[in-house]
Amino acid sequence: METEYGSIDDSPYGGGEGMVMMPEPLSKTIESIPNVGFRILLSPQGKIIDNNLIKSLAKKSTLTLICGRYEGIDERFIDSYVDLEVSVGDYILSGGEFGALCIIDAISRIIPGVLGNPDSIKNDSFETKLLKGPIYTRPKKFHDKNVPEVLLSGNHKEIEDWRLYQSLKRTLQRRPDLLDDVKLSKKAKKVLEDLRSKLIL
């Protein structure tokens, strides 16, 4: 919704670059929504989204995602109408719409009935607190690279052990921070200790 002057943004008080989204058009928009629910602002100043936050948001009956633009939104609107500010990462986007799409997709896939195979969620990266290891499909050979023999063996225990090893290895190499608070089985702890003694990161 626009002001009577037909605009939704104006220059910042005190000077500075860019334009600021005005509070009045935004407040009128929010107040026109019959069931606004929990109000989220996509903002570089917000809490970084992770899987735990997505699970928490998925429990809300209604969400309204407010997407910032330009230099940002008048702070008075944020103070009056926003329940939570969130960010999808430490980088700059043209607006909050792309971040909102990320939130919508992440929440949608954990709603029962959305995914064809609900069991696939259980082994997702960040659901297990570990990154997934390499995955393969046909053909068996591509650019002189073969599918690991263990995956063709049919031995489920060996395949499970291989996947655990690869998952821990990849997490240790690429996202070691995820291992800080992860709960591992005795078996996984032993594998991780072995990896740490062998790998030069």
Go through the PLM ranges and name each one.
Residues 16, 68, 155:
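Conserved RecA-like P-loop NTPase ATPase core
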Residues 139-201:
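SAM-dependent methyltransferases
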Residues 77-124:
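Structured adenosyl-cofactor binding patch, chiefly the S-adenosyl-L-methionine
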Residues 2-5, 9-26:
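A short aromatic-anchored loop/beta-hairpin motif
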Residues 98, 110-150:
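Internal, active-site/partner-interface "lid" segment
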Residues 1-4, 47, 92-95:
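A short acidic, often aromatic-flanked loop/helix-cap motif at beta-alpha or helix-coil junctions
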Residues 20-69, 75, 112:
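S-adenosyl-L-methionine/SAH cofactor-binding core of RNA-modifying enzymes
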